[in-house]
Amino acid sequence: CGLSEKKLTAYRRARITGVTYANGSLYYTNLTRNIRAGMQNQQTQWRWLISSFLISVFTLVPVIVILTSLFAPTTSTWSHISSSVLPGYVGNTLLLMAQVALYTTVIGVGTAWLTAATEFPGRRILTWALMLPLAAPAYIVAYVYTDLLDYSGPVQTLIRSLTGLYAGEYYFPEIRSLSGAAFIISLVLYPYVYLLVRVAFIQRSATLYDAARTLGASPFYAFWRIALPAARPALVGGLALVLMETLADYGTVDYFAVPTFSTGIFRTWFSMGDKAAALKLAAVMFSFVVLLIVIEKYNRRPSQAQAIARDGNLQRTQLTGLVAAGATLLCVLPVVLGSLIPGGTLAYFALTTGDPLLGHGFTGFIGNSLQVALSATLAAVIIALVLTYAKRLTDSKAVNLSIQLSTLGYALPGALLAVGLFAPVSQFDRAIATFFDEQFDIQTGLLLTGTVAIVVYAYVVRFLTVAFNSTNSGMEAIPPIYDQAARSL
């Protein structure tokens, strides 16, 4: 190893006394200090493991409550629901998910391929503009399109004035329907598919696509048989996110009077007053979520085609004439329908009509929104840092399992979270109130139910995945040697 006999002898003696050599240089270490540091390191790992486990329990409360409801006694309300309206909930939810999956696939994959593989006027602007509809809540877009496309709206009024027809004499699609809800939700959620599939086209499909084109394949054949299969995991991942958000949607389907799981849960709880039946309905809904998670995890498995197609950049084809104009139009339509029309309509109403009472309550609205947003963000980031550092220090299977369970909340629909959290929190509040009333004659009231704390709790469970992925990506960019250097100082 390039050391002299004298240095080799000193190195052998150092193995006993605690002196360590590396490349002939002398580093003094204390064996006792190393032993103590190892013991402290084991204790630290146990602390991080326990912390990650407690966080997973904290975030899994809604799931635990819902799963335990399956073993609760059956009520008359649940018997009525399971025999009468449950098939309708299942059918409408599946039909809504199928339509949304179809629409978002067509819009997302089509625009992703055009912006990734072709060159046309406005491509650079449309590449980021196609993400804008994701910023609009689906129920707000539903309000706007209902106002525009309803019988008394400007669109049908213009049709009647131009044609002279009356109600019932012409066909116009009903916006407040299941198909209308699928259309609205698709306009808002297609960017999930667009973003993931576009990256897959650029990074994974380039080599195989160029090879197919070199061997004489037509552009459509190379896209359909080569590029699209290589991007299948990204497409399935995007669709899984879209369908989870579709399951979670309540405002759109409730406003359009479409009976789905989300509307059924709240209707069972608040209209029928049966929490147990609502929890059982949420458990059925949770089975859909689990199925989507399993499908998404299964399609993450790497394939040979994906491994081959990782290198290279996709060469864009220059479009000209009517083809280029058509590509521009196809990419402009989702932006106009999903972002510009809703945003422009709301801005027009705000400027022309407005609300005279807005100034009195607007400050309070902003304050409440900022309070909840900042509190949830701070709590989620702190918890995410704990999970990230636990993974960094230990990287054990137990910690990784705790992290996977803790970040499951992003797949939980809002209705499921509401039912799964409200039931145990309300029971806890009643138990505390009863204890203080009986023991100290103090009326505490409800400490958590109906407060900002429970809302923040729900948001943390829902969006901890986003916070963890961001912090973990940043932490992985920091070499572990920095941690060791800091501890040595």
Language-model segments: residues:
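C-terminal transmembrane helix and the adjacent membrane-cytosol boundary/short C-terminal tail
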Residues: 27-30, 34, 42-48, 55, ...
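Short membrane-interfacial helix/loop motifs at transmembrane-helix boundaries
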Residues: 42-45, 49-88, 93-98, 152-153, ...
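Membrane-interfacial helix termini and adjacent extracytoplasmic/periplasmic loops
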Residues: 35-38, 75-79, 83-87, 122-125, ...
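Interhelical loop and adjacent transmembrane-helix boundary motif
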Residues: 44, 176, 250-290, 320-324, ...
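Transmembrane alpha-helices
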Residues: 53, 102, 132, 136, ...
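Transmembrane-helix boundary motif in ABC transporter permease subunits
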Residues: 99-130, 143, 147, 197, ...
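Glycine/proline-centered hinge or cleavage motifs at structural transition points of membrane proteins
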Residues: 215-216, 229, 489
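C-terminal structured domain segments across diverse proteins
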Residues: 343, 358-489
